[in-house]
């Protein structure tokens, strides 16, 4: 998997950018708030069909503009693919248009055209944050490698919203309980499909992450386990109906899943040091890259956003070793110091300032 070229127009702080990328290591240097993260985000959007950091898609549109455009040429499996992702805003309405080789595609069908693993400082929330961060991690990985996962997830969310709406109407005496039957059945069916995909992925991810973690930490044991919904979700939905009616929301299902992360048998979120948590995150992200490659047959593009400065020498060395082994890598940093000179000699190095990408020096 290789990103050949990237074009941005009115995207965040990039008024216009046309960029050719090298096949291996691409390094972008620059001070904070110059556009380094925005650049990596644009590639992640092509992999996920949505931003992993924007609260609203309208946030992607640059100042004094009505739309934002991301275009790319990608080489994958011996073929070249042209991708286009446009976000536009008219009045209060935001829309997006996605094209693959000029043909319109739905957002849920874009993931898989580009495989990428994004690693940035906020990923520490994978360990120390709430369950929603770990569910997002699983979803962002699975939409890239499990055909139809994105569609199933989108449908599950719509059915869940409908069920929660009905719960409120039933509690208010505006609907009968029998109106839930069809939605409960579909929620259980979709939820089972999501849970199965997540459980299989974690079973494959766990040994990869454990091996990486042991190598970086000097022998610590990283354990992953899936805290998913009950096997018979339909029965649980019926049994917990009274509680759901009181709360006006659905209490069981994969929207409540979690990924348990333990180090030497102890919960990493509650008891691990920050250094141990960072090691776990590095191990998880590298394992994600390995899993995407094993499932898709394509080595994903590795996106590293100013993370080297956040790591101590041992973890930095482990990550840089993987950078040397990886396919295409796009990495940002405030300065070149964290990179070995031998690695920099092989890299395409450019500087970013105020939304402009130029040669350094």
PLM segments and residue spans:
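Walker B catalytic acidic pair
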Residues: 305-307
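Nucleotide-state sensing region of NTPase/ATPase domains
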Residues: 47-133, 137, 142-149, 203-211, ...
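Conserved NTPase motor "head" modules and their coupling/switch loops across ABC/AAA+ ATPases, GTPases
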Residues: 1-31, 45, 174-301, 310-314, ...
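Structural recognition of the conserved hydrophobic beta-strand(s) that form the central parallel beta-sheet
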Residues: 72, 328-335
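Long, charged N-terminal accessory/stalk domains
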Residues: 125-126, 132-181, 185
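Hydrophobic "anchor" residues on beta-strands that sit immediately upstream
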Residues: 18, 97, 116, 301-302
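Conserved lysine of the Walker
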Residues: 36
């Amino acid at each position: 998997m290789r990103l050949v070229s990237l074009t941005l127009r009115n995207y965040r702080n990039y008024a216009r950018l046309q960029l050719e990328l090298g096949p291996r290591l691409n390094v972008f240097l620059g001070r904070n708030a110059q556009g380094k993260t925005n650049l990596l985000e644009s590639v992640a959007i092509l992999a996920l069909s949505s931003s992993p950091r924007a609260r609203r898609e309208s946030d992607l549109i640059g100042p004094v503009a009505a739309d934002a455009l991301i275009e790319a040429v990608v080489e994958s499996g011996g073929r070249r693919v042209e991708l286009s992702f446009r976000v536009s805003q008219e009045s209060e309405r935001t829309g997006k248009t996605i094209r693959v080789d000029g043909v319109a595609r739905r957002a849920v069908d874009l993931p898989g055209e580009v495989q990428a693993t994004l690693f940035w400082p906020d990923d520490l929330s994978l360990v120390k944050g709430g369950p929603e961060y770990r569910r997002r991690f699983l979803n962002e990985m699975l939409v890239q490698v499990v055909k139809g996962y994105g569609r199933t997830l989108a449908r599950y969310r719509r059915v869940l919203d409908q069920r929660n709406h009905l719960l409120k109407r039933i509690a208010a005496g505006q609907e009968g309980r029998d109106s839930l039957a069809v939605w409960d059945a579909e929620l259980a069916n979709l939820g089972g499909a999501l849970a199965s995909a997540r459980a299989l992925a974690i079973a494959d991810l766990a040994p990869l992450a454990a091996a990486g973690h042991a190598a970086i930490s000097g022998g610590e044991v990283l354990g992953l386990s899936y805290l998913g919904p009950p096997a018979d979700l339909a029965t649980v939905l019926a049994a917990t109906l009274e509680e759901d009616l009181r709360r006006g929301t659905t209490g069981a299902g994969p929207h409540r899943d979690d990924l348990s992360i333990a180090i030497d048998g102890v919960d990493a979120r509650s008891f691990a040091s920050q250094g141990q948590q960072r090691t776990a995150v590095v191990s998880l992200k590298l394992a994600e890259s390995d899993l995407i490659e094993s499932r898709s047959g394509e080595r994903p593009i590795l996106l590293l956003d100013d993370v080297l400065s956040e790591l101590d020498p041992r973890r930095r060395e482990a990550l840089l070793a993987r950078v040397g082994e990886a396919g295409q890598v796009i990495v940002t940093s405030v300065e070149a110091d964290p990179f070995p000179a031998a690695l920099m000699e092989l890299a395409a190095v450019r500087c970013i300032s105020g939304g402009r990408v130029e040669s350094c020096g």
